[in-house]
Design a protein with these regions (language model features):
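Glycine/proline-rich active-site loop of Rossmann-fold NAD(P)-dependent oxidoreductases
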Residues: 92-106, 140-150
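Active-site Tyr-X1-5-Lys
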Residues: 28-31, 58-83
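Active-site beta-alpha turn of Rossmann-fold NAD(P)-dependent dehydrogenases/reductases
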Residues: 1, 42-46, 86-88, 153
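Conserved beta-loop-beta element that borders a ligand/cofactor-binding pocket
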Residues: 45, 71-97
Length: 230
């Protein structure tokens, strides 16, 4: 779970919520799979414990995902092979499945959300496609190294470069101003490495896990076309 699932009514703290649904529930699921006879498994995690380890113990979400990742990989044994794939920001398209955030990005880049300010936040990050994640997951299930945390990724972009790809794909090219303001679609509350942070790295195990790279621009073009026609 992430910030989207945290109750906003004050009924539970983020720390307690993440502890229950991540730290406790996810390892319990993998333990049940192991007891049921599953011999190989892959945990889909987040890149923050590896690229923003300074946030462990400081940010409840990053702390929780780190705890969960370590607990799952600790189950590795001669009879149970388990590794984790730690992902950056993921994008992809499944026909018939609408993602509100993607729909909002398309509308924003198309100029349909004229009430929102047009700019880019500071910093940037790595992105990967859901297709590449599927390829890596299949490979990891087949021959992933037990107990290993793989840091996956495709391309590094500043938020300015990334958003300008959306505007270009929407037929509304822009040279975006970079501001320190909270962005309406990429707010600081989801920037778990820290507001304005730049997360840039060379992905691991690209050949070992045989996943495609340099797919971001083409995927954005596909998404804009699909959502514009919906």
């Amino acid at each position: 779970a992430d910030i989207r699932q945290v109750p906003m009514d004050g009924s539970v703290t983020p720390e307690d919520f993440y502890r229950k649904v991540n730290d406790e529930a996810v390892p319990r699921f993998f333990a049940a799979a192991r007891e049921a006879g599953v011999r190989r498994a892959v945990y889909i995690g987040t890149f923050y414990p590896q690229v923003a380890s300074h946030r462990i113990g400081e940010c409840p979400y990053v702390t929780s995902r780190s705890n969960t990742d370590e607990a799952v990989r600790a189950m590795s044994s001669d009879s149970f092979t388990v590794c984790s794939l730690n992902l950056p920001f993921v994008m992809g398209h499944i026909p018939g499945l609408d993602i509100p955030h993607i729909g909002a990005l398309v509308a924003y880049a198309s100029g349909a959300l004229s009430e929102l300010p047009v700019f880019a936040p500071k910093g940037g990050t790595n992105h990967i496609t859901s297709h590449a994640v599927a390829q890596a997951t299949l490979a990891a299930l087949d021959h992933g190294e037990s107990g290993r945390a793989y840091l996956l990724g495709d391309e590094n972009y500043s938020w300015k470069e990334y958003l300008e790809l959306w505007f270009e794909a929407a037929g509304n090219p822009q040279t975006l101003e970079v501001r320190e303001d909270d962005h309406p679609l990429l707010p600081n509350v989801i920037m778990f490495a820290g507001p304005g942070a730049t997360v840039s790295y060379k992905p691991e195990a690209v050949e070992e896990l045989a996943y495609d790279r340099h797919q971001i621009k083409a995927t954005i073009n596909t998404l804009v076309k699909a959502y514009s026609e919906a």
